[in-house]
Amino acid sequence: MSTRVLTLTLLKKRHLMQCFWSTVGSVHLRSIASDKIPSHAVEASLYVHWPYCLKRCSYCNFNKYISRSENHDTMTECLQKETETLLKLSQVSRITSVFFGGGTPSLAQPSTIAAVLETVTKNSNLSDLAEVTLEVNPTPAGKARLKDFTLAGVNRFSIGVQSLNADHLRILGRDHSVQHALQTVSEARKLCPGRVSVDIMFALPGQSVSCWQKQLEELLYVCDDHISLYQLTLERGTQLFKQVESGKLSVPGDEVTAIMYKTACRVLEESGFHQYEVSNFARNNAVSEHNMGYWRGHQYIGVGPGAHGRFVPHGDGGVQREARTQTLEPDVWIKEVQSRGRGTRRRITLHHLQLLEEVLVMGLRMNEGITHQHWELFSPEANLQQVFGKSANIQELQGGRFLILDDRGLRCSWEGLVLLDSILPTILLELEMFFHSRGIKRTQ
């Protein structure tokens, strides 16, 4: 199998993973593996969604609402109430990390962040060393609040730089300048040295490989120890999608996009960054502990309008993990939380084969892949060699040096990571065929 046969589909924006999780589900260490409650069943991470933005970027179709006259006190009370309700429902005793995303959570009051964290500590154990991340829009207003956010309990920032090119920022509809971005990163590094991540996008309209490499080199002069790369995604219905569809703008093709991605990997590696996941790079071991929890299949609780969660509702007598989606519209969500403690719009019980699919989809994103020990926690009845070892399709992927199955486990090669979205359907089909041969269907 050659790279020409495979269609390049790189990782899109981080938030889009949540859309995928809502259909595939997430991993739960089931009682099939042990009669005892495993450690992951009593701990989880927490995602808190702030839905408001000052404006909508031209490429964004995520769940966000233009800030008007939202009541910060009401939002704070509801975020606290839903956090308490879902913590009690999950019965987790330890929160391993907290991530405030959006929307633009740097628009929230620092007192709101402090209040949510206080609720967490009252209802579970949150270590003083736990990672607490806040996404920041690098505007002067966002920069001015950084210190107050650290006083509220934030110890890691994720800065949405997106580009260091003024024309690209304008095309993307961003409300910050290159100078604003650089100043915000610098201030964040002073407050949280070694714990500042920068988001940057590639495959932008009119962007060349040389322009992209120049931006990366400029970024390396100012960034901290974590960088996330995101390929521009043209989402139907967005302003940017319409501009490209009409021919007013053009984006790089697949081959150029692939070169951009490989260029980034090379440039970052030469600067001491280790690629630990498809789109994430860290040096000095500054990985995102919160995101590692997602990729390793740990439980997580989603709070706020449109947030997604994956946990076992032990408080309701549940024994299987559920995929949960909170109500999208902030006003409706607020009313639901005020009336019944939570605004959960959808609950889906996740079955065994769905869980194994999630182990593969999320685990193969990581450079470390899936170890035999990790797989056994979810599938004690069939190990990786039994499921994939005799498959001609898997052997072809191994022969093409895209996939590795050995005594360590199952993982992608460097080329395989680049083409992950293209080879995943083959891997998932083999998983389904194996379990169907044993009489296990996807919804059992």
Swiss-Prot record:
Residue positions binding [4Fe-4S] cluster: 53, 57, 60
Positions of the Radical SAM core domain: 40-274
Subcellular localization, as worded in the UniProt entry: Mitochondrion
Entry binding sites for S-adenosyl-L-methionine 2: 103-104, 162, 174, 199
Pfam families: HemN_C, Radical_SAM
Main location class: mitochondrion
Any one Gene Ontology cellular component term annotated for this protein: mitochondrion
InterPro entries associated with the record: Aldolase_TIM (IPR013785), Coproporphyrinogen-III_oxidase (IPR034505), Elp3/MiaA/NifB-like_rSAM (IPR006638), HemN_C (IPR010723), HemW-like (IPR004559), rSAM (IPR007197)
Family (UniProt): Belongs to the anaerobic coproporphyrinogen-III oxidase family. HemW subfamily.
PANTHER family per UniProt: COPROPORPHYRINIGEN III OXIDASE, RADICAL S-ADENOSYL METHIONINE DOMAIN-CONTAINING PROTEIN 1, MITOCHONDRIAL
Note: Might carry two S-adenosyl-L-methionine binding sites with only one binding to the iron-sulfur cluster.
Identification of the protein by name: Radical S-adenosyl methionine domain-containing protein 1, mitochondrial
Organism encoding this protein: Danio rerio
